[in-house]
Amino acid sequence: MESIYNFTLETLTQHLQTQDCPHPKTAAIRIFHHLYRERKVGPLTEGQISKKAINYLAKSTSFDLAKTISVQESKDFTVKFLIEFCDGERVETVLIPFPGRYAVCISTQVGCAMRCSFCFTGTQGLKRHLTSGEILTQYLIAWEWLECYRPRKAAQPKIVLMGQGEPLHNFEEVKKALLIFVSEQGMQLGTRRITLSTAGYLPGLKRFGELPLINIALSLHSPFNSIRSQIIPLNKSYPLEDILATIDSIPFKGNRAINFEYVLIDGLNNREEDARELAKILLGKKGIINLIPFNGFPGAVYERPSEERMAAFQGILSSLGIHATIRTTKGSDIFAACGQLKHLLEGS
């Protein structure tokens, strides 16, 4: 059966029209309000939509959310969910604490084809894309948990598409999910509160204008193609200069800016020459530089730099006119930090 969460408002209306259900668009809007405004799990009842629509949906669609297999809580209040879909495939989703509010770090694929060498997910390979409904239900599950267990911090969470997978490699399903997240009849989430992270998957990046006006984060990680290709093998196909040129062509409106993500790996990309070349290619660009200390995982060949070396790298950027922040690591004690998601890890 098709998940009700896989439908956009338009496709749900068409779905009901095929069976001559009365007032299909009105019924579709009521279903959307039920799922996303009221966030109720389960089918609607007679009086909300027609009996014919109820009977048809009962035979053709599922109103079930994905199954939560486990929930882990970090000492810093990060929360990691292991979520299972109807075919038995699993992903991890993370609630990340910020002052006054949380963000939900959502996965877009089971595994990932990019095989970035700093990322535990990359060792899993790609098993399949997630559907738009599987992307959406991660958010609903995390928000419901937040309301139950941390109600004082349960304001509508932000979204970061930074979990398992490359979002732009699963473009169509991510696009459908985003349209529901921001739509008036859907979750009504402001576009400024959604950030999509990419390793630089150029075919999807060139279509970025088709998406709602969300924020974008580029996994940069080195200003040199030779080193970046070692960290992100995708760079061999889509080199950095092509990615930056494409990003420069994206019309960022208002005060939106790109987030440049830079994982600091000791002895590989945290040298003085790395900082100086990074400043050279980013000077004058409208963006924010997030320096992310490498987070270890079983089998990793990299090391995390010392606090002193990270501060020195930041200082060089600052002296060259580049504002950069060092991101605070969250959830590393439960393997929920950047680059650590992989549900096959024992104990997840």
Functional labels for PLM-detected ranges:
Residues M1-E89, P151, D248-R256, Y262-S348:
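Auxiliary Fe-S-binding modules of radical SAM enzymes
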Residues S74, S107-T108, S197, S219:
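Short linear Ser/Thr-Pro motifs
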Residues F77, Y102, A155-K158:
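Exposed loop/turn and edge beta-strand positions of beta-sandwich/beta-sheet ligand-binding modules
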Residues L130, G200, T329-D333:
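Short beta->alpha linker loops
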Residues E144-A324:
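Conserved AdoMet/S-adenosylmethionine-binding subsite of the radical SAM
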